[in-house]
Curated annotation (Swiss-Prot):
<protein>
    <recommendedName>
        <fullName>Ribosome-binding factor A</fullName>
    </recommendedName>
</protein>
<keyword id="KW-0963">Cytoplasm</keyword>
<dbReference type="InterPro" id="IPR000238">
    <property type="entry name" value="RbfA"/>
</dbReference>
<comment type="subunit">
    <text>Monomer. Binds 30S ribosomal subunits, but not 50S ribosomal subunits or 70S ribosomes.</text>
</comment>
<comment type="function">
    <text>One of several proteins that assist in the late maturation steps of the functional core of the 30S ribosomal subunit. Associates with free 30S ribosomal subunits (but not with 30S subunits that are part of 70S ribosomes or polysomes). Required for efficient processing of 16S rRNA. May interact with the 5'-terminal helix region of 16S rRNA.</text>
</comment>
<comment type="similarity">
    <text>Belongs to the RbfA family.</text>
</comment>
<keyword id="KW-0690">Ribosome biogenesis</keyword>
<dbReference type="InterPro" id="IPR020053">
    <property type="entry name" value="Ribosome-bd_factorA_CS"/>
</dbReference>
<dbReference type="Pfam" id="PF02033">
    <property type="entry name" value="RBFA"/>
</dbReference>
<dbReference type="InterPro" id="IPR023799">
    <property type="entry name" value="RbfA_dom_sf"/>
</dbReference>
<dbReference type="GO" id="GO:0030490">
    <property type="term" value="P:maturation of SSU-rRNA"/>
</dbReference>
<dbReference type="GO" id="GO:0005829">
    <property type="term" value="C:cytosol"/>
</dbReference>
<dbReference type="GO" id="GO:0043024">
    <property type="term" value="F:ribosomal small subunit binding"/>
</dbReference>
<dbReference type="InterPro" id="IPR015946">
    <property type="entry name" value="KH_dom-like_a/b"/>
</dbReference>
Amino acid sequence: MNPIRRRKIEAEAVRTVAMMILSGKVKDPRVHMVSVHRAEISEDGKNMKVFVTAICTDKKKLKVLSGLNSAAGLFQTTLSGKLGLRITPRMQFLWDEEYIQSLDESLRLTRKPTSAD
């Protein structure tokens, strides 16, 4: 797949998923207050990983991912319709550990040292 086309599909996937969650089109109660960070489509365009986070416990995190993965068909259909895709990528939702780590690192660097440090 052309790299420019791939980036366009990934960007539209992030926008589409975020918009559908925020607008309430996803009725699953497990899916709320979710941030969509990035998407990665495979070379052949058949699979897509969508990376998300939410402010929640580890137990709730599994429920959020389960809710998103159960709504994947809705997201895929909407994305395919928007972009006119011949092959609709199968979406898999994953927790964005990389984003969490970078956020933790940023917080650690900006934290002011105290007398205990």
